[in-house]
């Protein structure tokens, strides 16, 4: 199996540009024969989103992008996003293919040192 690792540098909160970049790299990977396409953690928001996570609509825009990626998927794709459950935020990874979001994995060990503030 050919696995494509798409290391992109999304601008935090620029959801339209992030969508375009993911779409472009995903299509390119498929065209080059990838059987699985992988993007970085929190690619749907950019990293680190910091206090933008608490801005009205930020999480929903991120989740709308997750739905769009899933809907337009064919070859399996794994990518990072932020999800909210009972007002608790998770740094998560989604697995999507054939137009469906098949599963989610939540990061367990969050860094809380130096420039990282994922514990908040």
Model regions: which residues?
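Enzyme catalytic cores with a strong preference for nitrogen-chemistry domains
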Residues: 1-120
């Amino acid at each position: 199996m050919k696995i494509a690792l798409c290391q992109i540098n999304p601008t935090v909160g620029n959801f339209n540009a992030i969508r375009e970049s993911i779409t472009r790299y995903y299509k390119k990977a498929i065209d080059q024969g990838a059987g699985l396409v992988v993007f970085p953690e929190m690619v749907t928001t950019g990293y680190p989103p910091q206090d933008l996570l608490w801005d009205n609509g930020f999480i929903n825009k991120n989740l709308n992008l997750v739905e769009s990626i899933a809907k337009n998927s064919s070859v399996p794709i794994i990518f990072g996003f932020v999800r909210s459950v009972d007002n608790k935020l998770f740094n998560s990874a989604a697995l999507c293919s054939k137009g469906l979001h098949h599963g989610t994995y939540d990061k367990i060990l969050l860094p809380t040192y130096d420039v990282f503030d994922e514990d908040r």
